[in-house]
UniProtKB/Swiss-Prot annotation:
Broad class of the protein's primary localization: plastid
Source organism of this protein record: Oenothera biennis (German evening primrose)
Gene from which the chain derives: rps18
Subunit organization: Part of the 30S ribosomal subunit.
InterPro entries referenced in this protein's UniProt entry, alphabetically: Ribosomal_bS18 (IPR001648), Ribosomal_bS18_sf (IPR036870)
GO biological process, one term: translation
Places the protein is found: Plastid, Chloroplast
Protein name: Small ribosomal subunit protein bS18c
PANTHER family: 30S RIBOSOMAL PROTEIN S18, SMALL RIBOSOMAL SUBUNIT PROTEIN BS18M
């Protein structure tokens, strides 16, 4: 193979195949909170199928299970609101406008 054609060939990098997020023995059910909570974001949203790396059927079952768990109060609709701690107030001296009389 001449040098001009060799430049366009991509090197084959080896990659490690990840394990599927749902094993064959896992049962997708609204009562299985430990499994369901893996597919919910920090904000409490259901993660997309691309992020979860699930099949279409698995994603549908996960979505239904999450919604059922929310209705039955096993999962919250919204995560707990984080309280912001107020720091001690400091006097603001820079940038204050003074009124001309």
């Amino acid at each position: 193979m001449d040098k001009s054609k060799r430049l366009f060939l991509k090197s084959k990098r080896s990659f490690r195949r990840r394990l599927p997020p749902i094993q064959s023995g896992d049962r997708i059910d609204y009562r299985n909170i430990s499994l369901i909570s893996r597919f919910i974001s920090q904000q409490g949203k259901i993660l997309s199928r691309r992020v979860n790396r699930l099949t279409l059927k698995q994603q549908r079952l996960i979505t239904i299970a999450i919604k059922q768990a929310r209705i039955l109060s096993l999962l919250p609709f919204r995560p707990k609101a984080q309280r912001f701690k107020r720091s001690q107030s400091t006097a603001r001296t820079v940038g204050l406008r003074t009124r001309n009389k």
